[in-house]
């Protein structure tokens, strides 16, 4: 986390990315995608791509800033505390609401990063531990070499797209490192040609992903083929070249915005990660979407009513995150006044630096 003031275009992208992630989870975990083919279900097919698209944009943003940053182990400790804090809070809420939790849920919530309770934050921690090495590589070469490196890595994405179910050289961490490489190069290279066409690229790729999802759904329904239906969102997967291209388009569309520094936007952007931790805990997920949000009541609702409910969920999450985060930050300040912890942090930083 950097203290210096950031321009708000990337922070606005951070907010946008989290909103589309939440909406993607709304239609997926809320069960809207599993309903009969309808206007609401067609709209859900559009929102479905937001999850992986938003995560890809988040990694691009991180790389954009970290490529010129120094490693700080305190950030890792703060991130681990934040992840575990939210996991424990949610498991307590689940206990209150349902009356029971398992021993596994309790232990894994306390040590959430170790047990990979949240896949995205765990992969991010791994990426943060490695980013100084990637920075050395990126900073060593000129623009021509870096663009060539990106070109040579394109087949890595295509392999996963062409061979359904392939895990060739894939893990959440390796994919984040791959995306980090792209985001770092975006900061170092002149990308004006891409930037000029970025909005067109984003819209075109989003439409292609949407149409492919609808098309495969229709084919699957008509042929009663569950295999086709199960892969209807294949083009919206995080390894899809279309998702990467769409994320690149979205990234540069926001990058070229000239909105200066807006403190309101920057303040809201700080809540994006807490929003993620609040709504996508696998142990709390069913309670949240089924018992609190109750998406099933809006499966067949008027389209405008559905939109209003989605907006209410998004706003509610940001408000809840602001309250929980206010409490967490105060606990964090107490924790990091420990002289012993600060000595450990200093020693780790010396090893990296």
Indicate where each model-derived feature is located.
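Hydrophobic transmembrane alpha-helices of secondary-active transporters
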Residues: 56-67, 179-186, 277
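Alpha-helical transmembrane segments of multi-pass integral membrane proteins
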Residues: 17, 23, 86-89, 150-159, ...
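Membrane-cytosol interface segments of multi-pass membrane proteins
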Residues: 1-155, 259-261, 271, 284, ...
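Alpha-helical transmembrane segments in multipass membrane proteins, preferentially the mid-helix core
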Residues: 127-136, 180-193, 244-260
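Interfacial loop-to-helix transition and helix-capping segments at the boundaries
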Residues: 42-55, 108-123, 161-179, 214-247, ...
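Loop-centered beta-sheet repeat module
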Residues: 145-191
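C-terminal ends of transmembrane alpha-helices
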Residues: 26-31, 94-101, 155-167, 211-226, ...
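Alpha-helical transmembrane segments and terminal signal-anchor/GPI-anchor hydrophobic tails
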Residues: 193-274, 281-290, 296-310
């Amino acid at each position: 986390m950097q203290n210096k003031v950031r321009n708000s275009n990337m922070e606005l992208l951070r907010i946008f990315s989290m909103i589309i992630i939440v909406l993607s989870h709304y239609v997926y975990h809320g069960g809207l995608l599993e309903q009969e083919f309808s206007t609401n279900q067609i709209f859900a097919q559009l929102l479905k791509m937001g999850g992986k698209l938003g995560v890809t944009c988040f990694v691009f943003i991180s790389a954009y800033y970290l490529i010129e940053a120094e490693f700080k182990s305190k950030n890792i400790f703060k991130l681990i505390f934040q992840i575990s804090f939210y996991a424990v809070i949610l498991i307590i809420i689940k206990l209150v609401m349902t009356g029971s939790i398992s021993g596994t849920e309790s232990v894994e919530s306390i040590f959430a990063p170790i047990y990979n309770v949240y896949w995205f934050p765990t992969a991010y921690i791994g990426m943060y531990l490695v980013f100084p090495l990637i920075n050395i590589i990126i900073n060593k070469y000129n623009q021509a070499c870096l663009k060539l490196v990106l070109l040579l890595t394109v087949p890595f994405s295509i392999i996963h797209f062409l061979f359904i179910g392939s895990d060739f050289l894939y893990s959440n961490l390796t994919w984040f490192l791959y995306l980090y490489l792209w985001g770092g190069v975006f900061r170092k290279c002149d990308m004006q040609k891409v930037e000029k066409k970025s909005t067109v690229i984003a819209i075109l790729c989003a439409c292609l992903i949407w149409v492919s999802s609808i098309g495969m759904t229709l084919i699957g329904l008509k042929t009663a083929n569950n295999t086709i239906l199960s892969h209807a969102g294949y083009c919206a997967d995080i390894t899809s070249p279309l998702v990467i291209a769409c994320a690149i388009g979205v990234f540069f569309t926001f990058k070229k915005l000239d909105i200066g520094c807006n403190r309101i936007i920057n303040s809201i952007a700080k809540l994006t990660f807490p929003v993620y931790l609040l709504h996508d805990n696998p142990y709390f997920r069913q309670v949240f979407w089924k018992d609190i949000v109750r998406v099933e009541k809006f499966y067949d609702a008027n389209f405008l009513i559905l939109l209003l409910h989605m907006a209410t969920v998004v706003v509610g999450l940001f408000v809840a995150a602001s309250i929980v985060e206010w409490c967490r930050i105060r606990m964090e300040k107490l924790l990091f006044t420990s002289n012993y912890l600060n000595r450990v942090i200093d020693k780790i930083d010396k090893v990296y630096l």
